[in-house]
Amino acid sequence: MGAVSMESLPLGFRFRPTDEELVNHYLRLKINGRHSDVRVIPDIDVCKWEPWDLPALSVIKTDDPEWFFFCPRDRKYPNGHRSNRATDSGYWKATGKDRSIKSKKTLIGMKKTLVFYRGRAPKGERTNWIMHEYRPTLKDLDGTSPGQSPYVLCRLFHKPDDRVNGVKSDEAAFTASNKYSPDDTSSDLVQETPSSDAAVEKPSDYSGGCGYAHSNSTADGTMIEAPEENLWLSCDLEDQKAPLPCMDSIYAGDFSYDEIGFQFQDGTSEPDVSLTELLEEVFNNPDDFSCEESISRENPAVSPNGIFSSAKMLQSAAPEDAFFNDFMAFTDTDAEMAQLQYGSEGGASGWPSDTNSYYSDLVQQEQMINHNTENNLTEGRGIKIRARQPQNRQSTGLINQGIAPRRIRLQLQSNSEVKEREEVNEGHTVIPEAKEAAAKYSEKSGSLVKPQIKLRARGTIGQVKGERFADDEVQVQSRKRRGGKRWKVVATVMVAVMVGVGMGIWRTLVSS
């Protein structure tokens, strides 16, 4: 048949049969002699042509880098099954493992991948020409029945030499060759979907706040997501004197610790706003909270400058600082509060005087964290960041030390000390029953062995060890006895031998 031009077909038509269709339809008809039904695939001996000459012999003219051909089986040996795949310029080399082709869970064929090499083996140069060879495995398609001819179907590819978007050419070629369904083929023209120019309005609930908007709107209506860590620092810290919500306190009392003689900065003993009430109000209505409103939440009984120093721990900071301060301030608080005991007179405490050094270490760590946070945050977004001022605590001795958490160290006995005590408590006890049994055994055996049995007790486990000790004199005597017995035996044997020899000589003389 004549060549079929792709221009005569509507745009989007492709000749891409699946592996099952190539074997179960095209190869079956070709092997059974129905050549007119599969004339869309030409009959070419690919081993007599170079791979770059084969695209011109294809019936279907297409711009896609793949072509189909029927090829008669050319045996390399008359009685063998190996195919002759050598051409004038090179050879086809099989690579990889043969893949099975199934139709409804039934094996109908195999697919072999071959690569063309220039020159002769083993010094051939690999090229970008690849071929898939399809062969049937069914008994009725072996080509030996009457009217059948042995054929294989070859699918030729050519890989691009350049890289496409950083992807290797091998992967691009195999990816393109595996698109069989119409859904995998897309048009070359891709139209962009027009984006909406409508600006997204900020919810009214966030008006009046300073740092709770989750995105910023630009002039063209594009929404820019604000980083989560910037939400904590999106308001001015200079005018903020009231504490922002932080992690929930684990102390039973709120802010008033007047039962232990705690004094506020303004000299009054009135407690500030309750921490529980403050957190409940903030977390229940987070949208209504703002930096301006936080100042008005103070207790009227306390002056603006009369916020106690303990509340400064709840100042606005980055999430890392808030977590670090809360962790350092409230670690092991349950165990520590159970052990705290305050004096009845003047709020005296029995803690050591190195509390100020503990606070100075905390202040230094806090300054280091603030410095790192300032270096990591980007500038130029209208966010004013101010480092937190260190809390200067005056040394008031042991009388008024505030509510700072202390750390109690519990001393545990090490394993070495326990072992030493066990070794000291170890005793060697002689068991009378074992001693009598050993004495009876020595009397029966007649040996001069001195039995000595010791009991080594460790805790509740006792180990009885029997040890037999003998003096040096006893050992020497026993050795002498054994040596005398040996000589007696040797002498007796020699006498018997001599007597026997003499009797033999006498009998010989008598008989003669």
From Swiss-Prot:
<keyword id="KW-0805">Transcription regulation</keyword>
<keyword id="KW-0812">Transmembrane</keyword>
<dbReference type="InterPro" id="IPR003441">
    <property type="entry name" value="NAC-dom"/>
</dbReference>
<keyword id="KW-0256">Endoplasmic reticulum</keyword>
<keyword id="KW-0804">Transcription</keyword>
<dbReference type="GO" id="GO:0005789">
    <property type="term" value="C:endoplasmic reticulum membrane"/>
</dbReference>
<dbReference type="GO" id="GO:0045892">
    <property type="term" value="P:negative regulation of DNA-templated transcription"/>
</dbReference>
<feature type="domain" description="NAC">
    <location>
        <begin position="9"/>
        <end position="159"/>
    </location>
</feature>
<dbReference type="GO" id="GO:0071470">
    <property type="term" value="P:cellular response to osmotic stress"/>
</dbReference>
<protein>
    <recommendedName>
        <fullName>Protein NTM1-like 9</fullName>
    </recommendedName>
</protein>
<dbReference type="GO" id="GO:0031347">
    <property type="term" value="P:regulation of defense response"/>
</dbReference>
<dbReference type="Pfam" id="PF02365">
    <property type="entry name" value="NAM"/>
</dbReference>
<feature type="DNA-binding region">
    <location>
        <begin position="108"/>
        <end position="165"/>
    </location>
</feature>
<dbReference type="GO" id="GO:1900426">
    <property type="term" value="P:positive regulation of defense response to bacterium"/>
</dbReference>
<dbReference type="GO" id="GO:0000976">
    <property type="term" value="F:transcription cis-regulatory region binding"/>
</dbReference>
<comment type="function">
    <text>Transcriptional activator activated by proteolytic cleavage through regulated intramembrane proteolysis (RIP). Calmodulin-regulated transcriptional repressor. Binds several synthetic promoters with randomly selected binding sites. Functions synergistically with SNI1 as negative regulator of pathogen-induced PR1 expression and basal resistance to a virulent strain of P.syringae. Binds directly to the promoter of the PR1 gene. Acts as a positive regulator of innate immunity. Involved in the effector-triggered immunity (ETI) induction of immunity-related gene expression.</text>
</comment>
<keyword id="KW-1003">Cell membrane</keyword>
<dbReference type="InterPro" id="IPR036093">
    <property type="entry name" value="NAC_dom_sf"/>
</dbReference>
<keyword id="KW-1133">Transmembrane helix</keyword>
<dbReference type="GO" id="GO:0006355">
    <property type="term" value="P:regulation of DNA-templated transcription"/>
</dbReference>
<feature type="compositionally biased region" description="Polar residues">
    <location>
        <begin position="175"/>
        <end position="196"/>
    </location>
</feature>
<dbReference type="GO" id="GO:0003700">
    <property type="term" value="F:DNA-binding transcription factor activity"/>
</dbReference>
<keyword id="KW-0539">Nucleus</keyword>
<dbReference type="GO" id="GO:0005886">
    <property type="term" value="C:plasma membrane"/>
</dbReference>
<comment type="subunit">
    <text>Interacts with calmodulin (CaM). Interacts with SNI1.</text>
</comment>
<keyword id="KW-0346">Stress response</keyword>
<feature type="transmembrane region" description="Helical">
    <location>
        <begin position="489"/>
        <end position="511"/>
    </location>
</feature>
<dbReference type="GO" id="GO:0005634">
    <property type="term" value="C:nucleus"/>
</dbReference>
<keyword id="KW-0472">Membrane</keyword>
<keyword id="KW-0010">Activator</keyword>
<keyword id="KW-0238">DNA-binding</keyword>
<keyword id="KW-0112">Calmodulin-binding</keyword>
<dbReference type="GO" id="GO:0005516">
    <property type="term" value="F:calmodulin binding"/>
</dbReference>
<keyword id="KW-0678">Repressor</keyword>
<feature type="region of interest" description="Disordered">
    <location>
        <begin position="175"/>
        <end position="204"/>
    </location>
</feature>
